[in-house]
Design a protein with these regions (language model features):
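Short, glycine-/small- and polar/acidic-enriched structural segments
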Residues: 32-185, 189-195, 206, 211-212, ...
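Secondary-structure end/capping motifs
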Residues: 234-318
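Pocket-lining segment of extracytoplasmic ligand-binding domains
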Residues: 98, 178-273
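Short linear loop/turn motifs
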Residues: 71, 277-286, 323-335
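Short, low-complexity disordered leader/linker segments with a strong preference
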Residues: 1-38, 337-338
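Predominant activation on well-ordered alpha-helical scaffold segments within soluble catalytic domains
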Residues: 55, 101, 157, 199-202, ...
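Conserved C-terminal helix/tail region of periplasmic/extracytoplasmic solute-binding proteins
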Residues: 306-338
Length: 338
């Protein structure tokens, strides 16, 4: 599996090569691994520890075992992943629901096929000294976001909406992925982040903080796998195998967090500390499961909860149209579906 970073020209591993002919049972028929179907994932970020299950393909071969050659293109947020998908650079986007539904609202023909993280991982963090404890306290504040195309920005909008505020009532500061350094240096009053980002920030010396978790307001999922409608219609067999491989990799990381933490040292850009990796992986494993996945398996969507989230998006102006999630989310490609 290659991790293509055009700007840095960094390769995490060598491209998969054809192996001996092996046959694996996929949906009742054999697939030859001597002929690999290529799937390019448009990522929301860089090759970091929380996606270790995708980074270990060279060692574990989850995708190759399903006759898939998997490559990842990094991005600068979920909207960036959608852009890379729409431009044809990728087959699948790893993106947040807000970016997905915003694209749908604009008329793009897309379909979500797997709920990667059914728990909302986003939060807003501020130093205790700022006394920011509720959304209304954000008025007039400088707030950091990973990028203007990121889920941190969209989820900040959810919090602002709770207090009847908009982005016009605050100052948005783009901080990049290391968004806790500007907070610690006083360049921003608060920063929109994720659970793993907060964990890493604390490991790097972030002091006492107040945390507002978005899930306490709208617990919509954090990330989906999204494809173009034409890809969904034309490549269902390949996508089924891709989702089975991803589910296998996610189940492995849940089952073997210590092994994943060790491999992250080798494959993740931020994975130098194995014990820190383990904490990140445990957090991400916890957000991969929900009451719905307990019943129907990893990747299953809670359609009712997601519809509530979409209605909230319309309520604060992120989208303009009424969107029925059943029209743009399909579960027929999930592992176990016929």
């Amino acid at each position: 599996m290659s991790f293509v970073i055009p700007s840095l020209k960094l390769s995490i591993s060598s491209t998969l090569t054809c192996a001996l002919v092996l046959f694996t049972s996929i949906s009742g028929h054999a697939q030859s691994s001597s002929k690999l179907d290529k799937i390019v994932i448009a990522g929301w970020g860089k090759p970091i520890t929380e996606i270790t299950n995708l980074l270990v393909e060279e060692d574990k071969g989850f995708f190759k075992s399903k006759s898939i050659e998997m490559t990842i293109i990094p991005g600068a947020g979920g909207a960036d992943a959608i852009r890379n998908l729409l431009s044809g650079q990728a087959d699948v986007a790893f993106t947040d629901p807000a970016s997905f539904f915003t694209a749908i609202d604009k008329g793009e023909k897309l379909r979500a096929i797997y709920d990667i993280y059914p728990q909302n991982i986003f939060n807003l963090v501020s130093l205790k000294s700022q006394n920011i404890t509720k959304p209304s306290d954000l008025k007039g504040k400088r707030i950091g976001v990973y990028s203007l195309a990121s889920g941190t920005r969209q989820n900040l909008q959810i919090l602002l909406h709770q207090a009847g505020l908009t982005e016009a009532d605050v100052t948005i500061v783009v901080t990049g992925l290391l968004n806790f350094l500007p907070l610690m240096q006083g360049q921003v009053d608060a920063t929109a982040a994720t659970d793993t980002g907060l964990l890493v920030g604390k490991q790097k010396g972030l002091g006492d903080v107040n945390v507002m978790e978005v899930k306490n307001y709208v617990n919509i999922s954090s990330d989906f796998f999204v494809v173009r409608e034409e890809t969904y219609q034309q490549k269902k067999d390949v996508l089924k195998r891709f989702l089975q491989a991803y589910q296998d990799s996610a189940e492995w990381m849940i089952r073997s967090p210590q092994e994943a933490a060790k491999l992250a040292v080798k494959f993740a850009l931020d994975g130098q500390n194995e014990s820190a990796n383990l904490e990140v992986i445990k957090l991400r494993n916890a957000t991969s499961v929900s009451a719905m996945t307990q019943q129907k398996g990893l990747g299953a969507f809670d359609m009712g909860l997601i519809q509530k989230g979409v209605n909230a998006y319309k309520g604060f102006g992120l989208i303009q149209r009424d969107i029925k999630v059943a029209d743009v989310i399909s579960q027929d490609l999930l592992p176990g579906k016929k």
